[in-house]
Amino acid sequence: MTKILHIEHPEDTILTGDTSFLQSIKGKQHLSMKIDGAPAIVWGINPATGKFFVGTKSVFNKVKIKINETHADIDTNHEGKVATILHDCLDWLPRTNGIFQGDFIGVGGSDEYTPNTITYKFDTVIRENIIIAPHTFYTAESDLRDAIARPLDFVITDTPYCKFVKSDAYIYSGWYDRLGEEFELSPVVNMIEELMQTVEFVTDKEAAQIKKNVNRSIREGYALTNDDFLGNESLMHLYGLMIVLKDDLKAQCRQLDGPEAYLNGERISGEGYVMHNEFGTFKLVNRRSFSVANFNNPKYATV
């Protein structure tokens, strides 16, 4: 568990020689759909005061902390659309124990929502006041800055005022009456493990620069080069194999329930999947399809 749950792309984890993803895929999985909402909403009981609060991820800031226990707090800390959303969340989110994080989907009254890049279509018109896609649960002893995160692996019940969207997924087993929990691994896993014996891995600082280079290549639409990997050709090759492995695993995943997803009017399986077990939490996303769409979306922002 980590203080703030940042879900990594598998290929990014390998840059420093981290083997947790390779360990993870050899065991049983807890699988869910990755929901493309915005902004991120954090809510629950503030351990410092015992009062209910709402906020964005800024509630975890070390210095300029923005925890909102009243509407006046929201007016002081936020403005514009984010403030409006937080006012709705303060009014309609249930007062339950614990601390949660999820993505805001929208307000009730429709059966179709485009909170960020992907459009979600529900079976019926949503009658609840707000819609949230929860994904993370936090525990904290006395201060939100000390909160410890873990993936949300239990169900939050809808209320008459708030609809919670958590779309489960499974691994295709080949049997119509059996939901798989383990991946079928291809020979590329052995290729990766063999290549790792000869690769010179990079530091955390160097890995951060490589990730920036990768994001730039996606945003600007050019192919990755050796220079993007700081001249480390074998690491670039390993990175490519990890993408092949990720795509193979993603192809084995299936949506179990939840709203239909559309991108630019075309039906898609969703943004991707989130897999979790004792070795960590990872996202299986086609970055060339969805990250570039997010980069080019004027609504896209980290709040």
Predicted regions, residues:
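A two-mode feature
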Residues: 135-303
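Short, ordered beta-strand-loop transition motifs
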Residues: 47-48, 125-126, 266-269
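Short, surface-exposed beta-edge/turn micro-motifs
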Residues: 28, 38-40, 129, 269-273
